Amino acid sequence: MLDIKLVKDKELDELWHIHADTQEDVENARPFGANLELWENSTMRFRKNDNSWWGIPGGSDAVAQVVKEGWAEGARKVEKVLGQIEPPRVLSSRRKKSRGPTGDEIDMQRVYAGSLDSAWSCMKREDGGKLRSPMSVTIVAHVGGNCHRDAEELFWSGACAVALARALRNSGRSCEIVGMFYTSHTTDEGKGICVEIPLQRMGAQTDLETLAGVLCLGGWFRNHGFKLMSMAPERVRSSYGRVVDRIPQCVKDKYTGAVIQITGVYDQESAKRFVQEETSKWR
């Protein structure tokens, strides 16, 4: 499902916040009528075998295949550069059965007895009084870029998210990952656009190749990101606006607790520094 709202941001008067629940929602949707030609031209114009735009040979068709099957080469690159950086493992947590109105298993005896508020059960982690860092983390990564950014530059923000997801998984924590992109002066009316899509739900199994195929591959954003922006119900400028390297308030407000925000990372050294600084906070 797509959710399109006009919201206010503290630095921009108004912007269109476009949220997609899944990648399939983006694939099945059509851009706003006034933006259809712009989106078709932007994808067709670069459909040639241009690695600097798509990130891999074969154009948008190859990108679609990688998004579906995962990107082993991208995952290996992340592992080689950022894979040695780890937060400490969680050793003091334990799991305890918890009952409530939702969960993983249902007790039919409680259902028949009318105790619906405690009929479901699931196993939850307990701190035990020794943990210094949260067990669940949200990673919000600014993963896009306009035409002046090549695929190698777009790789590194996503690489930070993949490396942190791997490190959090290996240390016994769970995370959700959200990809977003934010521009100002994007429509003819002068409004900005922020697009947002969840790429890994909290508690889901972390598949590094699948994550690399969307977060690190410039072509994923060229296909999905630009298409999402074209769904704004106003005419979008051909430049797709000016990139704003921060997370807007409308996205920040949706995620509470431990949140890692990734913005302005466009090269290998910046990615190393960012991941090292973030993992050092978990000690």
Model-found features: residue ranges?
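Acidic, glycine-rich A-domain
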Residues: 1-69, 134, 145-151, 155-159, ...
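Residues that scaffold, gate, or flank divalent-cation-dependent active/transport sites
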Residues: 142
